[in-house]
């Protein structure tokens, strides 16, 4: 495992849409482990692959809810409901914070690091963190959201 260098601010990779992961091979598994280590090293609650310079549909989240790190490969948000507004920040935009309106509840489908499909119902802070990281896969940053 290794800590990866983060991409910051105006790096154009943060604005690009990520590609689907076709094969969860050893390189992808190492990337996931590196992302988890990088997230924790930088005191983050989530990290998406473009933040470490890789345009693949992968993100990791630890919402500090006791579940540990969760891995999402090729995620698809199936449902959104409710509304919440709270302040967000981002490891790629250090020192920047702003209130962002997001769905309060979501249902997301993804693959885990072993290629097993799962569906997760998330709400509150976990739902917010997932939506924030999912946006990164679409080339969207939290500063793009209007209240």
From Swiss-Prot:
EC number: 3.5.1.88
GO biological-process terms attached to the record: co-translational protein modification; translation
Domain of life: Bacteria
Cofactor details (free text): Binds 1 Fe(2+) ion.
Entry GO MF terms: metal ion binding; peptide deformylase activity
Catalyzed reactions: N-terminal N-formyl-L-methionyl-[peptide] + H2O = N-terminal L-methionyl-[peptide] + formate
Keyword RNA-binding applies: no
Keywords: Hydrolase, Iron, Metal-binding, Protein biosynthesis
EC class of the enzyme, as a word: hydrolase
Requisite cofactors: Fe(2+)
Active-site residues from the entry: 133
Binding site for Fe cation: 90, 132, 136
Family annotation (SUPFAM superfamilies): Peptide deformylase (SSF56420)
Alphabetized HAMAP family for the sequence: Pep_deformylase
Described function: Removes the formyl group from the N-terminal Met of newly synthesized proteins. Requires at least a dipeptide for an efficient rate of reaction. N-terminal L-methionine is a prerequisite for activity but the enzyme has broad specificity at other positions.
Family: Belongs to the polypeptide deformylase family.
This protein's name: Peptide deformylase 1
High-level lineage: Bacteria, Bacillati, Bacillota, Clostridia, Eubacteriales
């Amino acid at each position: 495992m290794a800590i990866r260098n983060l991409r910051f601010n105006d790096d154009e990779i943060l604005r690009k849409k990520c590609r689907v992961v076709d094969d969860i091979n050893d390189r992808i598994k190492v990337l996931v482990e590196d992302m988890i280590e990088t997230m924790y090293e930088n005191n983050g609650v989530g990290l998406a692959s473009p933040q470490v310079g890789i345009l693949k549909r992968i993100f990791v989240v630890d919402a500090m809810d006791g579940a540990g790190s969760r891995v999402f490969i090729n995620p698809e948000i199936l449902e959104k409901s409710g509304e919440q507004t709270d302040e967000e920040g981002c490891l790629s935009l250090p020192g920047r914070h702003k209130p962002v309106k997001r769905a309060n509840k979501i249902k997301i489908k993804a693959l885990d690091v072993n290629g097993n499909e799962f569906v997760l119902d998330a709400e509150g802070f976990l739902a917010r963190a997932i939506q924030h990281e999912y946006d990164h896969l679409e080339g969207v940053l939290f500063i793009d959201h209007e209240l």
